[in-house]
């Protein structure tokens, strides 16, 4: 991918975006720098340097799960780049009606890129392995949410300028969002604390990977006590207690996660200027209270906005 805002910025990134693990720290830093340039151009009213980059090209969106921020921002990005969007109606779970590899080999004859939101990372990986020409983007799977993680670290960079000596705490389910956030933060030098109830911890394999890829000075620390996890941190992050597809477990999950609610008392344990983050949608009154969501230190809608600026990089 080559992008030319104001002055020439040549940025070469891996063909696919399936996991933060696939990107080097240098890739992440390049992505953040170019995104910042694109965002500045937008607010200064400059013509987008990426305009018409997809002219005459098509992007397919395969979504098994509902989506607001991911779908809208990718659709806007494709249109701003001059491309067309193809949204096949999925009548069965992606990869069930026919092999994911066969879907990939068909789509590569028609489209330039495919944005996939799926219940299974394995199907996404199978799809990507089957094509050498399609640009495949993970718009969320059961194990990772790399697009969200990029928006998160870009938002942190906007507020902090530097990641040096910064710590973020993730409170809640050790899920796909927590996984990608951990991958991204330690690659860029942050320390991350993750507090989860027993049985909902980050998988051991993820912890091993995070430890392996951590930049010098960065680390991951696991907690069962959310109060200890947020002590003197620079940012507090949470996510829904019940993810899509887990609705039958909602009542049981709520009873387990209630002590992990992010409220004003918990935020008071963090640094006085600590920011609050959430990938949305938020369930107010469950994982976070209205007071925290609507506080001046909440950056949740900045995160949502930045999904758009990052989508221009992904496509």
Task: Show where each model-derived region lies.
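Glycine-rich phosphate/diphosphate-binding loop of Rossmann-like nucleotide-binding domains
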Residues: 64-73, 160-232
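Phosphate/diphosphate ligand-binding glycine-rich loop within oxidoreductases
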Residues: 46-157, 284
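Rossmann-like adenosine-cofactor binding region
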Residues: 211-290
